[in-house]
Amino acid sequence: MIHVFFNNQKSDSLKMSSPNKSLLFLAFIFIFLSQNSCSPGKNTGQDQKSQLLQLKKEISEDLLENLLPYWSMIMPDTINGGFYGRVDASEQVYPNADKGGILNARILWTFSSAYRIFKDSSYLHMANYAKDYIVSHFLDEEYGGAYRTVNEIGEPADTRKHTLTESYFIYAFAEYYRATGDQKALDNAIEIFKLLEKHALDKDLNGYYEVFTRDWERSRDLLLNENSPEDEKTMITHLHLVEAYAGLYRVWPEKQMEERLRNVLELFINKIVDKETFHTIYFLDRNWNPTTQIDSYGHDIEGAWLIVEAARLLNDAELLEDVEKLSIKISNAAKEGLEEDGSMLTEKDLSTGHVVTIRSWWEQAESIVGYLNAYEITGDESYLDISMNSWIYIKNHFIDNVNGGWFSLVSESGEPVGRDKANYWTCPYHNGRMGMEVVERIQ
């Protein structure tokens, strides 16, 4: 009997009584290691174990020898502090580019998590550097929360408060506290959480609004979908609130935090996931009516595993069972974006039939974690095959073996298309987190 062990309980996660399905998920594969008992085309248990360990080896090598060193070397702005706001596909640094809040928060999260797992002092140095710059330049001392962008010398540029951006600062500060025990970082995460609950929450219809002025007055500025003025709520923001609130609850298990995590998780389940297609609904009006018809495959598969991660923290066996079942349905829906070459497409507009065939780095990374999660839940090796094929595609097309790091976009034929390697959205968080999820899950 072969035991493939997945470690789903992080070393410093909440100490709770185990639900019916332990948080330490054991994927038991009962296979007799004889030719007669193996189905044609199926791997033996030993083959699966070898595959998983090889996957972990290759991904951890890329993480530790390529991805994290690349971001450590090229991104720090040694003149003005913080991190450069843009690096293009030819490795050209743009020192005058504005510095994005999401980019800086994601860098803080990535190196905090890396230090927590690997205990490498160089990662702590990067995390400290990121945290100090954020505290000094992004946090708004007068009105609270964090600016959306600052200029190259750290002065406020876009002072609007964007719920999505604020969620990443919660996520990053909570992870930094988890890695270092720095109380001020936890205080910062809690303060931003309370500001969102005060200003961003729709107290009548539930859910969270998108954009605010610096002093937290509601704004109808369109940041995520400039073509739909009816949008007031988005899948992306609610997904990353699930992620951020789960991260904060893990280190701050107060009753109010538990209630708000449960609320946003249930919102995602009941309002964001389409109960007929099991795709996530991209944009919605205030009353939760869809305003667009877009299937975003990467967000589907990312959401599929993040909702399970959140449910596991809530110590509710019935909820976890329901969420795991839903996660598999979402994962199956996201298969519509998978191509024969192992890649995942970006999205499809159902109103026009237009498919965005360009491949983005983050969807490929989330595909690995999402289908590994589905494999853990079900033991169905077809999900493991998807994760393996995603990694093969990444190795062949996304890893930059010349300059380091990953390309951010490749064409349908797998060629880099010249997109920035770092900017407001492009960061080490999706692929870095994928690497750390694989390292922690596969034991």
Language-model regions: role of each:
Residues 42-443:
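Glycan-recognition and catalytic cores of secretory/periplasmic carbohydrate-active enzymes
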